[in-house]
UniProtKB/Swiss-Prot annotation:
Function: Responsible for synthesis of pseudouridine from uracil-13 in transfer RNAs.
Domain of life of the organism encoding this protein: Bacteria
Record has Isomerase as a keyword: yes
A Pfam family matched in the record: TruD
Protein name: tRNA pseudouridine synthase D
Gene3D superfamilies to which the protein is assigned, alphabetical: TruD, catalytic domain (3.30.2350.20), TruD, insertion domain (3.30.2340.10)
Active-site positions on this chain: D84
TM annotation in the entry: none
Record gene name: truD
Annotated PANTHER family: TRNA PSEUDOURIDINE SYNTHASE D
GO BP, one annotated term: pseudouridine synthesis
Source organism (scientific name): Pseudomonas aeruginosa (strain ATCC 15692 / DSM 22644 / CIP 104116 / JCM 14847 / LMG 12228 / 1C / PRS 101 / PAO1)
Length: 355
């Protein structure tokens, strides 16, 4: 099986060649993620919400440990999104405990998992319920000239970056996409729910990345065209762009963005030449598109441009760059880093990342 690389799975950079190189994730503390949840918790109800810190542990394993310790089935453990294994992450989980007292969760805790807070709420935590993720990244072994590096950081803070799905979505060497293609060609869906979700996500993400790569290559990823579907940063709704919408000041302010397709049933609802481009993509990947539609995936949209909120940086040591920023839920910190630096292999992970 051929191994798929970064350009196969993502696409070209928008801001030019990397300014240098560094190591990310030499240790878990080099990649810290804090889930941002904008839900007021009532303090009462049949769902126990847990604010959990984990190190070197993926979200699914943390959920299994919490479920075992609480004595509940896995279907009664919920979380908003997956977080990277090779990282220090803090995120919410909820346990459905109707008519039950708070359980002793000590058996779930250890050096790699700590429960920082517990509270009750009337509803379970839904997938995708978090508003954003806050990142603190420590890039070590830095080899780059300071002036062009600072200039690049200022540029991406002002202009954003292409909102690619990161390599983590596709598995080691693109293995999840290879498996998705195999399923599509055989018209099969895995019986295992986690595998099914992983393969469908990989196929859908690949199609989006291919469309975004085309627009990055021609320089239109951050500009609205007539026929584009536009969306605000934190909204899943979208509207068709005419000439007036293409002049909306909120595009320049990075509040409003052109979108690309997350493939599902039916043709994309885009218009004019944008629809032609998206249908041409479907024509190059007919099996994958049919498979996604048959799986019952609804056609959705994703913003092409990723605004970076609160980007700050400093150099705690001459060869260390520390970045802090916030991204909308579902977006990848690694696609921000790739517009700045090349990552050397040491310390990189093959495990699912924050989304």
């Amino acid at each position: 099986m051929s191994v798929l690389g970064e350009l196969d799975l993502l696409g070209p950079r928008a801001h030019g060649a990397a300014c240098g190189e560094a190591v990310l994730k030499a240790v878990a503390e080099d990649f810290q993620v804090d889930e941002v949840l904008e839900i007021p918790l009532s303090g009462e109800g049949e769902h126990l919400w847990l604010w959990v810190e984990k190190r070197g542990l993926n979200t699914e394993e943390a959920a299994r440990r919490l479920g075992r310790a609480a004595g509940v089935q896995q279907k009664n453990v919920s979380y908003a999104g997956l977080k990277d294994r090779q990282a220090l992450t803090r995120q919410w989980f909820s346990l459905h405990l109707p008519g039950k007292a708070d359980p002793d969760l000590g058996a779930a805790e250890g050096a790699d998992l700590r429960i920082l807070r517990c509270t009750r709420h009337s509803r379970k935590l839904q997938r995708g319920a978090h508003a954003a993720n806050g990142f603190t990244l420590r890039l070590t072994g830095l080899r780059a000239e300071r002036a062009p590096l600072d200039a690049r950081l200022e540029r991406i803070a002002a202009d954003g970056v292409p909102n690619y799905f990161g390599l983590q979505r596709f598995g080691h060497g693109g293995g999840n996409l290879v498996d998705a293609r195999s399923c599509a060609e055989q018209d099969l869906l895995p019986a295992n729910r986690n595998l099914r979700s992983r393969f469908l996500s990989a196929g859908r993400s690949y199609l989006f990345n291919r469309l975004l790569a085309e627009r990055v290559a021609e320089g239109s990823w951050n500009r609205a065209a007539v026929g584009d579907l536009l969306a605000f940063t934190d909204s899943r709704s979208f509207f068709l762009a005419g000439e007036e919408e293409c002049r909306d000041a909120r595009l320049a302010a990075l509040d409003l963005h052109p979108t690309g397709p997350l493939w599902g049933e039916g043709d994309p609802p885009s218009g004019a030449g944008v629809l032609d481009r998206e249908l041409a993509l479907a024509g190059r990947e007919p099996a994958l598109c049919r498979w996604l539609a048959k799986a019952g995936m609804a056609h959705e949209r994703r913003i092409l441009r990723l605004p970076i909120q609160g980007l700050a940086w400093h150099y705690p040591e001459p060869d260390v760059l520390q970045l802090e920023f916030v991204l909308p839920a579902g977006c990848f910190a690694t696609v921000v880093v790739r517009e700045i630096l090349d990552l050397v292999p040491t310390g990189q992970t093959e495990n699912p990342c924050a989304y």
